[in-house]
């Protein structure tokens, strides 16, 4: 599934009140990259970090550190726009990255199914709901 890029940051970040953020506005703040390790982590990246050069990058390997650095350093990351407030709390914002931003790109959201296995009805429903959300929130990018 294709989706637009969003900036994920703390609610008191200097850019948190914007309706859209241009990539150049982020240059004074550290980009936070979530690293899961392994040889193929580039291909399974959770953000667009692998496609861009950033003036400041901090690599973390757990989400608690990432959200703490969003607060302590005014750091940010890029995401699909799908953020669960129940997991992250209400202290964070998701703001669209402008279409003409040099760091913008289309993200691919995918899923893995074990070979020769059929996706369960719950799995199918989950994928359907993600597609509906992305279509409604992002102007109907292709699936």
Task: Describe each region flagged by the PLM.
Residues 52-65:
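Short beta-strand-to-loop elements that line the ligand-binding cleft
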Residues 23, 29-52, 81, 119-128, ...:
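Secondary-structure junction motif
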Residues 8, 33-34, 59-60, 77, ...:
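Active-site-adjacent beta-strand anchor residues
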Residues 97-139:
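A late-sequence structural motif
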Residues 3-4, 65-115:
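Beta-alpha-beta core module
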Residues 31, 57-59, 94:
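Conserved beta-strand scaffold positions in the cores of enzyme catalytic domains, especially
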Residues 1-31, 35:
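Flexible hinge/capping segments at coil-to-helix
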């Amino acid at each position: 599934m294709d989706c637009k890029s969003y900036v994920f940051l703390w609610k008191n970040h200097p850019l948190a009140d914007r309706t859209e953020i241009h990539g150049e506005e982020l240059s004074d703040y550290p980009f936070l990259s979530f690293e899961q390790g392994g040889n193929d982590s580039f291909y399974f990246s959770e953000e667009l970090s692998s496609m861009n050069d950033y003036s400041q990058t901090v690599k973390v390997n757990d989400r608690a550190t990432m959200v703490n650095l969003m607060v302590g350093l005014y750091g940010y990351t890029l995401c699909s726009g799908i953020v669960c407030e129940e997991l992250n709390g209400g202290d964070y914002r998701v703001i669209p990255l402008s279409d003409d931003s040099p760091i913008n790109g289309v993200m691919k959201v995918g899923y893995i199914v074990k070979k020769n296995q059929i996706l369960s009805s719950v799995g199918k429903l989950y994928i359907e709901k993600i597609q509906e959300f992305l279509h409604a929130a992002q102007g109907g990018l292709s699936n």
